Every structure is written in C-alpha cells, then in structure tokens.
Amino acid sequence: MADTEKQPEVEENQPDQEQNEEQKEKKIIASQVSGTVKWFNVKSGYGFINRDDTKEDVFVHQTAIVKNNPRKYLRSVGDGEKVEFDVVEGEKGNEAANVTGPEGSNVQGSKYAADRRRFRRGGWYPRFRGGGRGGRPRQDMDDGAPDFMPSPRGRGRGRPYYQNRRYFGPPRRGGGRQYLEGEGEYQLQRDQGFRGARRPFYRPLLRTTSQGLLRRWLLRLPRRTTQGRTSQARRRERPWGLPQRQRPKPRQR
C-alpha cells in the first residue's frame, strides 16, 4: 500500500491581541454634565471642554460625540458651544463621553468642519426633444406643468433643459422658442426689427502648391518690358519671367 501523504495544516492568521481583548468599560464619574467647549481641533480630532460646575477642563475626542450635526462630514464641536456629556475615567485622566447638545440635541459642530455634499437623488431633467434618458418625475414638481413637457424614457438622468442653449448674440426682445403641437418641434420666434447674429466671414485658404506660390510671386513683381533689351539680356532671364539670381561680387582687397 502506498503511504498516504500528510497534508500540512493551514494556519489561519490570528488577529492582533489588542483586537481580541475586550475593551474594559470605563468608570463613569458624573453624568449629564453641562459645559462649554474651550477649543477643538478638527484636523486632529480632539479638544477640551470646560465644566460649568467645577471649572475643570475635560479631554474630548471626536469618537465621543454621539449626536453630530447631520450637515457636517466629520464629528466636531464648535468653540464656545454649550454641550452635555458624561465624565468617565480614562487612562490619562478624565475624559468626556456621550457628548450631545443641550437637552440631548445635535451639536452644532465646528465652523471649520467640511459640510456634506448635497446629491440629488432620483428625478429627471427634461430635454429639448423627446425624453431621452430619465427616471421617474419628482414629487415636488408642480402639477400645473405645461403639457408639452417631454415624457421620461429609460433609466438614469437626462441632460438639463436649456431653452436657448444654442443662441449666441445680443439679448432678445420678446423672442423665444414656440412649441408646435402638431409637429412636436420647437420653432425660433424672433421679434420684428431683430436681425439676429451676423454671419461669420471665412477667408478662403490659399493653395500651398508650387503653382499657387509661383502665381502669387509673379503678381507681386512689377511688369517688365522687353523693349530696349539685347538678346543676351533676354537669355539671362528664366523662361517664366523671373530674373536669374545674381551672385555678389567679391570684395576688392
């Protein structure tokens, strides 16, 4: 019989001892203590609160804030803000826990803390022609919307609707786009006396061929007459009328 091979046992990575150890519950010294924030650093995430009863400065960390301002991205308390908290015994002294606003409300937060971004969830944007991409209409839209609003099709968001998105020129006087119910399109309606934007002038491109360059060069040259010239001078000229290049005379020493 063949010897059975022993498979090595896979040792699982054990978590750190610090994570396995249960965190000891901190001893509560006082509860629902009111105080004023002395200072708080948003970047570092900690600060100090001055108790109203004993005038003692208590350390506070951002993780101790229970009810944060929902508009703020990070947990924080503002300088000079009135808060309520519990005093617990920490490793290096007294600390604040369960920090809330007055009477258990949300804290205002620091003015240096970043606000949350406001995303538009759902909804659709009407387009110029047709519905295109879009979702369900919003509930906060007025019921008295015009009948020619494009109906949404598909999923996702559509492009924003601009009435005069392709117009470049002076401001209009009473002009706009008029919807044609029969054709389902928009027609540009202009006021009387409005001429519209001026059409741009495009200069034609010049030819870069040798024939075009030669023609341009000949047009710039003055007209030459052959009267009074000898045959020897005529031979020096090129067949198309350009003079032969003259070499510079050597300097006399």
Swiss-Prot record:
Ranges where the CSD domain occurs: 35-99
PROSITE patterns noted in UniProt: CSD_1 (PS00352), CSD_2 (PS51857)
Full protein name: Y-box factor homolog
Highest taxon in the source lineage: Eukaryota
Species of provenance: Aplysia californica (California sea hare)
Location of this chain's protein in the cell: Nucleus
GO CC annotations, alphabetized: nucleus
Amino acid composition bias (Acidic residues), ranges on this chain: 10-20
InterPro entries (UniProt xref): Cold_shock_domain (IPR050181), CSD (IPR011129), CSD_CS (IPR019844), CSP_DNA-bd (IPR002059), NA-bd_OB-fold (IPR012340)
UniProt modified residues of type Phosphothreonine: 226
Region (Disordered): 1-26, 124-178, 224-253
Gene3D superfamilies: Nucleic acid-binding proteins (2.40.50.140)
Biased composition (Low complexity): 159-171
Keywords: Nucleus, Phosphoprotein, RNA-binding, Transcription, Transcription regulation
Post-translational modification summary for this protein: Phosphorylation activates in vitro RNA binding.
Keyword Transcription: yes
Classification via Pfam families: CSD
Summary of the function given for this chain in its UniProt record: Binds RNA in vitro.
Keyword RNA-binding tagged: yes
GO molecular function: RNA binding
